[in-house]
Amino acid sequence: MRWANFLHIYQPFGQQPDILAAVVEQSYRPLIKNLLSHENAKITLNINGSLLDLFDQYGYHDLIEGLAEAGRLGRVEFTGSAKYHALLPFLPKDEVMRQIESNNETNRKYLGESYNPKGIFLPEMAYDPKLAPWLEEAGFEWMIIDEIAFGGQVDAIDYNKRYKVKGTNLGVYFRERRVSNLIMSAVVRHAEQLKVAIAEDLASSRYVVTGMDGETFGHHRPGLENLLFEVFEQPDLELVRISDLADFYPEVVECEPVASTWASSPQDIASGIQFISWDDPHNDIHKLQWKLRDFTLAAFRKMDKKHADFPALRGKLDSALASDQFFWACARPWWSIEMIEEGAYYLLDILQHLPAIDPYDFETGQAYYHQIVAMAFSWKRDGKIYEIQQANNNAMRIPFKERTLEAGGAEPAVYQAFIDMMTNQEQEASKRRDYEAAVMWRDAVYKIENKTDMYEAVHAVDLLRTTLPNDEVEATIARYKDEYRRIRGGQPEQRGIADPS
């Protein structure tokens, strides 16, 4: 098995310096230090240009130098991206290309010759078919997107083959959810545990592409950075960069990826709401945010490019196209009034400084801004945020035992299948003397049996699904139940309503 691990690191361009300092010490600095100290380390990395600007602004020049050195040593392959983490499916072609080229310029400025991207990471792995020819035109050989993009289902990729988008020469590498979520969920915290969990893969000739936020290691998951550093030391793990895979897997298959993100579920895609965290058709704040974004973009396009203020306002617009404000307004469960207001203000500020803007146009934009802020405060004050989050969690608020064993019909078979699989995981962990994992599975069974499982951030059923290969889970369930179907998203902390199993 060859393992291509992709990491994405990013902070909003206006990130508070104290938050940035925490992430630097907890995640970025340890990561770069260990990339430089382990000769066998190999990763593919995206760092948005906006984060490199922050490193420079706040004096983290050692991080910039360390990344450049890791690139020179061949331990890091850098990808392209959108400089300000814009959601590319929602932009016209010229803005997409500008975000990409601005990111290239910034990365080259700081990283020098180490930055020579063959591939591109789309923020949130947000893909739309219209992007493929544009990315090829931008000079990229491949992109990394989630496996859900392959027909809207998971576990359909043959990782002994490579893929390219039909009608183009743009290669596609699909992020595998099971192994990615196994790590992100901290189900495994040591290299030996990981090797046990992927033993079948290790013995094969296939490749694995994992993908996650770099902040997972140390910041989101304190202590999990040690797993990554242990992986760098394992002689029996063949680590490669994504571009290296072409040297080992010559067969290429055409495919037609569907619109998706790395958080989309099959249900999201079937329902046409694959971008729900940023564009929820039932979220009135989202609707206003997009109206203000589109209005500002249209107003800016009327500006004379020869005007002295054009470059400064163009730069402001680039950064204002970031996806953050939409994400923090989704309330499933992510919510921040500060981020909502800040994103709207950046757009209003552009309108305010457009020369010769029609007063009526400015008043229209200002009205959008006030509506967004007022609605955000109203949702918080009136409890709507709580209602949305509660509705989002309704399925998980019902104990698994009630949804299965006590539901009658064929559902008790589902309950027993999962209890038996978890019990088996406990026993296997005990045999390996992995008592931490054994206790985790023992406690999971106890909570399910006593109906206290609905309070877990990551449910035991989801943990089991990241621990065992999907075909093994399905085969086990098939022995207990004639028909079984699951609907779940691509990230371990779910923001969508989950199926009972």
Cite the ranges covered by each PLM segment.
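Catalytic alpha-helical scaffold of carbohydrate-active enzymes acting on polysaccharides/glycoconjugates
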Residues: M1-K118, M125-F174, N181, V188-S204, ...
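Active-site and substrate-binding clefts of carbohydrate-active enzymes
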Residues: R2-R29, K33-H38, Y159-K161, T168-L170, ...
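Acidic carboxylate-rich catalytic motifs and surrounding loops in phosphoryl-/glycosyl-chemistry enzymes
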Residues: G49, A82-H85, L122-P123, V240-F248, ...
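Residues that line or immediately flank small-molecule/substrate-binding pockets and catalytic motifs
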Residues: E124, E147, R177, G214, ...
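Short phosphate-engaging motifs
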Residues: Y127, T216, A437
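Composition- and surface-driven signal marking solvent-exposed, interaction-prone regions
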Residues: A186-V188, R221-N226, A329-W334, W441-D443, ...
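C-terminal-biased regions
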Residues: A376-S501
